[in-house]
Amino acid sequence: MRIVYVTSRFPFPVEKGDKLRAFHQIRILSKRHEIHLVAISHKSISQEALDAMRPYCKSVRVFRIREWLLPFQILSGWLEGLPLQVSYFLDRTIKRQVQYHIIHIEPDHVICQLIRAAGYVRALPFRKTLDYMDVFSEGMHQRAVEHKIFRSFFEMEARRLAAYERTIYKDFDQHIIISAQDRERLKMPSKEHIAVIPNGVDSQYWENKGEHEPSYDLVFVGNLGYGPNKSTATFIVKNLVPELLKLKRKVKVLIAGARPGHEVSALNKVDGVTVSGWVEDIREAYQDGRIFVAPMFSGLGLQNKILEAMSMRLPCVTSSMVNNAIGATPGKHILVADTIGDIVRSIELLLDQPDRYEEMANAGREYVVAHFNWEDQVNKLEKLIITQNEYLPK
């Protein structure tokens, strides 16, 4: 099949969840199909990034949003009732160019990643799949709860996003999302017809061969410019570390990931805490920690950081919200804790019981290998596209 894959950001480098998902879906689909990448971008794309995608794509086309027009397109979209999350990515001049380009390709199918990009392709006369991936309206609702000063604004944006998520549904033939938990969060009557297709993990790449002795007791990895990850890093240092100190446990903590702002970077001042920021090979950060701690209580989707840690035989302590999307068995594959006391006790258990530590490290990797293989997940997407049928709930 000739497939056009449309993204709201260029899929490489894969430092964000949507880019990771797009990259691997394109990579695997390209083995049996002709892929044409259409990427919307607010910035210029490096030659290195372009070259990374070309082995998998018949054509790669980047449409650059005109930055100087952003205030006007955001205002125009707002007056039309569009969510900011959509109008920020929707340049109407580029829209015509994108549509002309795709029509010229004459695809058998169009995959559109995220509602951000849906406005570019919703009217095209081809069969189309929309990947909701996460539920943006729920994410905005969470921000409204957390930010009292801007609550009214975030609530309005959440309502607009929910309305757009419902409206855009009818313009696509198939629909997918990253987890059943996210599907349940959608406020629409037809959500049971949305297929759940999780991300995967390259378990050969994400493997810890035990050649490196960890320097830190606890590690957290993530895009540190993302709100829920910032909150998690701060929670670890300001809530967990002091509680562990009360128990006479002086732990060393590593916080690693791209775009640490002032708030996260300031955590470096706490004794025993290292904020490394961007790491060229993030596997080194995972290998440098004994326990992966991710007490996340907000956010959306499937947390790939947990899957990567489990794949590297790193026992994980996380929240029930995060594990709901993963589906691991608490106490066997992963430790689930939702209070400071329970999280601290989970950490102590793993620090004090080497046998339990090893059992969970191995069980976690086995679970990820069995349930989160990229090939298996993309095959589900391929089957949905080839059969050209709407997903029917089991």
Predicted regions and their residues:
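Acceptor-binding helix/loop patch of EC 2.4 sugar-transfer enzymes
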Residues: 8, 67, 71-88, 128-167, ...
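N-terminal subdomain of nucleotide-sugar transferases
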Residues: 1-62
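Acidic donor-binding loop of glycosyltransferase active sites
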Residues: 173, 287-301, 312-315
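Conserved acidic donor-binding segment of nucleotide-sugar-dependent glycosyltransferases
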Residues: 334-341, 349-354
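Short hydrophobic beta-strand element within catalytic cores of glycosyltransferases
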Residues: 305-308, 315-319, 335
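A short, well-ordered alpha-helix in the C-terminal region of glycosyltransferases
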Residues: 349, 356-370, 377-383
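Donor nucleotide-sugar binding/catalytic pocket of nucleotide-sugar-dependent glycosyltransferases
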Residues: 129, 137, 154-208
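Conserved catalytic-core segment of nucleotide-activated headgroup transferases in glycan assembly
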Residues: 196-288
